[in-house]
């Protein structure tokens, strides 16, 4: 019986957010892809909506008590990136993998009344069968929140993930054509 009393009741005003479909036009990519993997560090491997109060506690991560993500940030990023980047495997079924490392996914308060959604990630194009890195690029975005609360953070994070997915798609699209004499990324991803 005592074990049951340690569970707290779910607050009546508990909110679960996602970053939802955004109706973007896909970014066509000629580099053959067979998959998109999105990974995040352990502190981002939960549904907690995290924030940081820079003036008072710049090194402390906090989580909203009454608000959660519908899934882990890496899952939500994966869905958006997968919808935005339009790529197919090579005709032989081969293709590279896109690996996205989510390094930061947080609402940062610079004052009590102002905050931004901060997202940092690294995208790597991995060769078929070897996972050798063929190309890599870091991306970061800070989007001001319309309100300094969890709901405002969701709006900013949604816009930020969307922008980073488009940027990653454009980066992949810009990898073609190959520079002088080198195998193109399309060729290397088709082996």
Please annotate each region the language model reported:
Residues 77, 117-119, 160, 164:
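Hydrophobic alpha-helical membrane-association signature
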Residues 59-87:
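Mid-chain, structured segments of secreted extracytoplasmic proteins
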Residues 32-39, 52, 97-103, 118-124, ...:
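Soluble periplasmic/extracytoplasmic beta-strand elements of cell-envelope proteins
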Residues 5-22, 79, 83, 87-130, ...:
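Surface-exposed short loop/turn segments
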Residues 2-70, 177-191:
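A structural "domain/chain start" motif
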Residues 42, 73, 85-89, 109, ...:
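Sec/Tat-exported extracytoplasmic proteins
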Residues 58-68, 130-177:
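Short secondary-structure boundary motifs at beta->alpha junctions and helix caps
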